[in-house]
Amino acid sequence: MDFSCEKREKLKNGASMISFCAPHLHTVAFSVVLPFVPEYTPGVYHLVEHLFFERAGERRADEINAEMTSRGSEIDGYTSVSYMCFHFVCRQEVFRPQLRLLHSMLTQREYTEEDLQKVLPVIRNEIFESDFYDGRAGDVLYDLWFDSRYSGSVLGDSGILENVADEEIASARESLFTKDMCLFVAGNFQEEDVREIYDTFGEIPLKEREIPPARKEKRITRPLNRVGRGRELQVLVTYHVERADYELKMAAHWLRSALFDGLDAAAFRYFDGKGFQFYSIDGNYNIRGDELIFSYLVHIEKGDKKYFLPLVDGFERAAERTNFVSLVRPYLYENLVFLFDNPERLCAHYVDAWQDMSAPVTLQEEAEFCGSFTDEQLAANWVRIARSLRRVFLIGR
């Protein structure tokens, strides 16, 4: 694989940027990641995200939307529990004006009560809509973090948000702009486009990010936990590693893929052999700093609980014998070249890698590190996960 078109650099304001130039393509993708420690009222950062779409200098929401439409490119944004991300993909000839629009949105400082009253009903409806879905497994995973700042709701409570002080909203907004800001650009961009990034995002005043120590919390350590009642069960098996190192963080994606992705994955083969023919097994992992939570979720009837739970130990042992490399390498290593031709996916991949490592990671770094994985090495990392704090949740319906 040729990574000569990939570049990592520091902007003069301290922000990090990774770029991947592909002059044979017709599109350019751009993403900006704004990390934060969720110290404020739950939902405030999500509120700030909505406000960013209300004003951009003299332009109001209708004019912002009209500009995006005229270029055939929509700026999207989302808020996670620990960062905010904005991204877009467009034709090369409209990249610079679209970049300037996003920069103007994010550097807007003044908002009116009218702006706030426009976004609150949208947020209220978003919360209302999310309540229609059974998100209890996700709620359980949120609650597992030992630092409770990361277990708060991203959307928040609309009634509480209606009364949040303007000063708190402004303070949360300012806390986004630190030297941990990361920019990712990929595709057919020119030198003039890079200079535009320097002249816009490279000129935003950034401060050092203060990361307060984790709060000491009461920890849920019971091996078996029940949530709700009913004859249908979601079984959520979780593993919690407190001091995950660089290798384990890099290996987590490979382990999840080998164990749970596709019908030839280890979990499907094991549980099928034990009489459980699952349509899907939802394997997942999340990383916050040095905490890693690895999990999988299956659906069973309540009467099958006594047969399934003893298999959790058996799966841990069977998974050690997985042919990890043959299952995963074609997808996660050899298929990295697919990203060369898809700027939007490449920028999303950079964001995912940043989320896992809490730092920007180039494709070359990922390929060089993960390309040397062996079955024995990946099995050892799985053993480390399997021997960490395990908690099983029976979520009834």
Annotated model-derived regions:
Residues 1-64, 170-270, 390-397:
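His/Glu-rich zincin catalytic helix
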Residues 57, 63-210, 241-243, 251, ...:
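Charge-rich, well-structured scaffold segments of protease-associated domains
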